[in-house]
């Protein structure tokens, strides 16, 4: 489940019309959401609040062998007025990311009026509106500031600076600083990661630099098909999308070189929609070739190749129904002949509310029958709130993941009253993660076999619960 600050950053991207999915780093996001989800560790409590449309806070308290926590603050120059912040109102599908339907590429919005990086920082000029009145123009570009302090020592500070330079460019600066041991006089270790993103809808480029080993990087993604910046007059809906991308890294300090390339084929929403029966003859002729569904179920295929290490990975994700999705991944290394196979699924469940009483029954009909009174027109009861919101409040999702070594991971995420709860467990002969508490719990078992596991190892790798509340 996404943290509250990650959810606010996602809302910031939507408010500024920035497509985060049109990036090579999100090429396999669908399979990762279904196969690489993490389970909570022990007990963790999150308290968050969007105090104003521009300012948000979040506090975390957890027990992972010892008491730890974090304090996080976020400021946005873009007002997030339409962003639900209460944990009882946030759509669970925005927090529990599952199957991600790829959307058709769109052209960037060009009406922001941005000219340069520092243009308009302190300006308070006004521009005329349609009715002749003057409205204050955007004096500052869309900017987001986020800082998180992790406690107790060794204290770690994570900071993020996000700024929209132009409708097609975005600058991101991330800082990580860790304080040394209390008795150490050395300076805190710090690293800076800068990223400049350029997205035109048709293609995207990302340029990265990290002070850690002076690492330079580039990522690019190309979408085949028509350019959304030059739309046709009567375009037919696109049924599928083929994207190709690559990334490359180089460090002159450590002589580190890395690269990978990948392909993604995904059906678009129009591929599973039946053409309208009320369309005219001419439109029917047009849609006979372009509007016919090519698939009953939305699916996504990816292929990623890392030439230097000889790794090949393929994924196949399928949404069998609006509440059920499957995914699988197969990896192979041509140098070591090692392989990996992972399968997973997610199941969404909605607990329907009981149907409201009939309109002509005011709840007193039983009393009238007892008193043998004549039927009188009933007073229509107050209309109950929308059942759509209630369904959203009672949503829950169950995720299951298993690999070829029979390591099983279970995760349940749902809403209990006004709380967002995540509960997970890991089972298998080997641990999913190298967390310290899992290693300590295994060592504390005295080398006994538990649950049929291998001698000297524990089959039960841990269970955790995370509780979140936001206002």
From Swiss-Prot:
| Pfam families linked to this entry | MDM10
Paired cysteines (S-S): none
State the UniProt keywords alphabetically.
Membrane, Mitochondrion, Mitochondrion outer membrane, Transmembrane, Transmembrane beta strand
Regions of compositional bias (Low complexity) in chain numbering: 276-288
Q: Where is this region: Disordered?
A: 272-291, 374-394, 436-455
Q: What is its main location?
A: mitochondrion
Q: Record's GO cellular component, any one?
A: ERMES complex
Q: Residue ranges under compositional bias (Gly residues)?
A: 444-455
Q: What does the UniProt entry say about where the protein is found?
A: Mitochondrion outer membrane
Gene Ontology biological process: establishment of mitochondrion localization; mitochondrial genome maintenance; mitochondrial outer membrane translocase complex assembly; mitochondrion-endoplasmic reticulum membrane tethering; phospholipid transport; protein insertion into mitochondrial outer membrane
Recorded topology in the membrane: Multi-pass membrane protein
Superkingdom per UniProt: Eukaryota
InterPro entries, per database record: Mdm10
Question: Record's family?
Answer: Belongs to the MDM10 family.
| HAMAP family hit by this protein | Mdm10
Q: What PANTHER family does the annotation carry?
A: MITOCHONDRIAL DISTRIBUTION AND MORPHOLOGY PROTEIN 10
Q: How does it assemble?
A: Component of the ER-mitochondria encounter structure (ERMES) or MDM complex, composed of mmm1, mdm10, mdm12 and mdm34. Associates with the mitochondrial outer membrane sorting assembly machinery SAM(core) complex.
Its UniProt domain note says: Lacks alpha-helical transmembrane segments, suggesting that it resides in the membrane via beta-sheet conformations similar to those predicted for other outer membrane proteins and porin.
Known function? Component of the ERMES/MDM complex, which serves as a molecular tether to connect the endoplasmic reticulum and mitochondria. Components of this complex are involved in the control of mitochondrial shape and protein biogenesis and may function in phospholipid exchange. mdm10 is involved in the late assembly steps of the general translocase of the mitochondrial outer membrane (TOM complex). Functions in the tom40-specific route of the assembly of outer membrane beta-barrel proteins, including the association of tom40 with the receptor tom22 and small TOM proteins.
Protein name, entry field? Mitochondrial distribution and morphology protein 10
Could you tell me which species this protein originates from? Neosartorya fischeri (strain ATCC 1020 / DSM 3700 / CBS 544.65 / FGSC A1164 / JCM 1740 / NRRL 181 / WB 181) (Aspergillus fischerianus)
**Name of the gene this protein is made from:** mdmB
């Amino acid at each position: 489940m996404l943290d509250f600050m990650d959810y606010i950053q996602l809302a910031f991207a939507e408010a500024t019309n920035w497509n985060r999915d049109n990036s090579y780093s999100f090429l396999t996001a669908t399979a990762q959401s279904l196969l690489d989800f993490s389970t909570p560790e022990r007990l963790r409590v999150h308290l968050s609040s969007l105090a104003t449309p521009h300012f948000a806070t979040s506090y975390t308290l957890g027990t992972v062998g010892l008491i730890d926590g974090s304090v996080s603050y976020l400021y946005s120059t873009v007002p997030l007025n339409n962003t639900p912040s209460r944990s009882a109102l946030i759509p669970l599908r925005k927090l529990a990311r599952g199957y991600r339907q790829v959307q058709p590429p769109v052209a960037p919005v060009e009406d922001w009026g941005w000219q340069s990086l520092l243009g308009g920082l302190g300006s308070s000029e006004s521009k005329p509106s349609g009715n002749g009145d003057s409205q204050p123009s955007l004096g500052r570009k869309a900017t987001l500031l986020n800082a998180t302090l992790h406690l107790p020592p060794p204290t770690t500070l994570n900071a993020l600076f996000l700024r929209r330079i132009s409708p097609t460019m975005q600058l991101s600066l991330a800082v990580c600083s860790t304080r040394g041991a209390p008795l150490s006089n050395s300076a805190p270790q710090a690293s800076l990661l800068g990223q400049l993103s350029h997205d035109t809808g048709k293609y995207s480029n990302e340029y990265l630099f990290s002070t850690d080993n002076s690492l330079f990087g580039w990522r690019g993604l190309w979408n085949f098909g028509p350019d959304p910046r030059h739309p046709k007059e009567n375009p037919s809906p696109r049924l599928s999308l083929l994207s190709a991308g690559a990334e490359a890294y180089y460090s002159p300090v450590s002589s580190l070189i890395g690269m990978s390339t990948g392909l993604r084929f995904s059906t678009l929403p129009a591929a599973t929609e039946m053409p309208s029966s009320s369309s005219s003859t001419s439109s029917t002729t047009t849609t006979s070739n372009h509007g016919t569904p090519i698939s009953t179920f939305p699916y996504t295929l990816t292929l990623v190749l890392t030439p230097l290490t000889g790794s090949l990975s393929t994924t196949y994700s399928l949404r069998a129904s609006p509440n059920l999705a499957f995914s699988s991944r197969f990896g192979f290394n041509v140098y070591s002949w090692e392989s990996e196979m992972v399968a997973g699924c997610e199941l969404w469940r909605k607990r329907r509310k009981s149907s409201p009483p009939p309109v002509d029954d005011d709840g007193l009909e039983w009393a009238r029958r007892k008193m043998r009174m004549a039927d009188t027109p009933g007073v229509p009861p107050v209309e109950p709130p929308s059942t759509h919101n209630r369904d959203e409040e009672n949503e829950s999702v169950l995720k299951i993941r298993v690999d070829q070594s029979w390591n099983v991971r279970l995760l349940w995420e749902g809403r209990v009253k006004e709380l967002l709860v995540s509960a997970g467990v890991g089972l298998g002969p080997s641990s999913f993660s190298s967390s310290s508490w899992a290693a300590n719990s295994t060592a504390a078992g005295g080398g006994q076999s538990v649950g049929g596991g291998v001698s000297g190892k524990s089959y039960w790798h841990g269970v955790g619960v995370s509780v979140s509340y936001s206002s």
